[in-house]
Amino acid sequence: MKQLLFFCIITIFSICFCQFAAAQNNGVKKETQTLALGDSTVKINIYERKGARVTFVSPHHNEQIAVRLGREAIEKTGGRFVEIESLDENGNGQRRLNFSFKGVNYSLDPNRIFTENGRQCSQFAPEIEPLVKDFGERLLKIILADGARLREGERFLVAIHNNRDVDEQTELAQKSRDLTALGFSAGFAAMNLSQTEFHHQTEGVYLSNSEYDADNFVFVSTPALMSFFIAEGFNVVLQKPAAKLQIKNCAVDDGSLSVFAGLRNIPYINLEADAKFGEFRQRQMINAIYRLFYQQQRGLQQAKMKK
């Protein structure tokens, strides 16, 4: 009898604990897929919860504000967050993926592998390039349906990034390579001003009087998306259309997820924020993403009702 009572108590405790754990993560399911890269493996963590049909992607694991806010967004509002896990020897998040093949160590930027031209620009050894291509294609199949289109119910793909504070850069050459809204402006480049390294990729730039930090901006693939985020008060950068991205130039096609999406006419949004001071602003960007999703969803429903 005592054994039966003890068993019942343990069972009740286990059920309560499971219910508590489920409540703690608010229904967020975490799945980890392991992808081979040479003789090494890379963990891809996928957080998902019912709600808005939005996929967020964090390619760089050292950008911890982006990683934290991506998980937070899924927990609060739903959707899906894909995180590429990359840790150094101390267990800290790092930007690049380190891997080995046949006893030789290599390293790559996971956001420079999605196009053939981008992989060529990274100058991988001939025996490594097919391995990187295969890894990139399998990663895309996690992010997108069949690795080439939005998943059912989704309206756009969202990347989340953090960048280094441009004000911390002292040398002019360093400032020119810093990722800011100004860095995408061809007009500033024509005037030989600093911070214009990335203007080859863009069609236009909008600078908002509501934005206090040039490191905070939204990068979009279509004019319609640009209009929405302008109205929201953000700095906005518009990527070149697909026809203008088909140039075998590393300054244009760098192998990034944005270029891959642009070449395939996949609506794409990148939320960039200062790695030190951009948390509040990036959270506002994520909230705007959900407003955009539900706005587009309502528009789609209204269009169906009119038919």
What are these regions (language model features)?
Residues 18-23:
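Boundary at the C-terminal end of the N-terminal hydrophobic targeting segment
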Residues 7-16:
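Bacterial N-terminal signal peptides
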Residues 1-4:
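Positively charged n-region of N-terminal signal peptides that target proteins for export
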Residues 24-306:
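Structured catalytic-domain cores with a bias toward divalent-metal coordination
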